[in-house]
Amino acid sequence: MNNIKLHSISRVKVNLYLHVIGKRKDGYHNLDSLVAFPNIGDKIEIYPSKNINLTITGRLKKELPIKENLILKASKLFKNNKNGADIHLNKNIPISAGLGGGSSNAAVVLKLLSKLWNVPLPSIQDIVLLGADIPVCMDWRLQRMQGIGDNTSFISSHGYLWILLLNNGDKTPTNLIFKELSPNNFSDVINIPKLNDTRSLIKFLKSTRNDLEKVTIKKFPSIKILLDHFEMTSGCLISRMSGSGSTCFGLYEKKSEAVKAKNFLLQKFPKSWIKVAKILS
């Protein structure tokens, strides 16, 4: 029994576009976003144990308090559970970076614990209460995320692109950015056309935006500098901020273009976290 080990990567969540539709009476905002999950992320391992324990390693472990971690909160969603688990998180994804790292961690742990304990997943209602964007992180296919994040649907796509992600270390807390939003930042509901190939995807994305970008740039002007440098790279089809920032990304048709852009940006921002990955395949 003690030799059982379950493990998984916990992928980053990238908002290819992010529209804020309006503010609800409960204070939350209604969103509309196309979400992709490049094969980059933290690593999670789970072992059977008498109690629930969490250990964190990796270059960012000191920035992540254990007591308030979403992983521990997620483990408590299994009602009337008497099982335990040793959970090991190797944390390498930037925190407060617009990549949904905490929500992705929680989603992966929910799936692994369900498998380890052979019990059903908690209700979607309970999962949403823990984190509005945890449900979309339960599946890594291309998805449209609406409502407060609890309304998700799969989007069919063909072909693949290469994504270059860059984070300069700025912390952009989501609640801070949303507090600065005004109706002038809101968008109307749109229809997503059939995405028959990567060309149609890029054409569609160019008609969209990230409604949080302008607000975040006012607080963190360095993000505008990052985006300007993405536009300087050869082959960049579109550049944008993910989520509430501060991570920015560029999409490329060829891996060689993304790698060349990575080398260029590393020269300009040598202390940044920067990764290349395939998406939409």
Per-range role (PLM):
Residues M1-A97, K115, V119, S157-G159, ...:
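ATP-binding N-lobe of GHMP and related small-molecule kinases
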Residues N2-A36, N118-I238, L251-S281:
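ATP-dependent small-molecule kinase catalytic core of the GHMP/sugar-kinase superfamily
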Residues I71, A97-I124, V136, W140:
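DPxDG-like acidic metal-binding loop motif
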Residues I71-A74, V109, L226, A261:
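Generic structural signal for hydrophobic residues
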Residues R240-S242:
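Short glycine-rich phosphate-binding loop at a beta-alpha junction
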Residues G245-C248:
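Conserved glycine-rich beta-strand-loop-beta hairpin in the small C-terminal domain of fold type I
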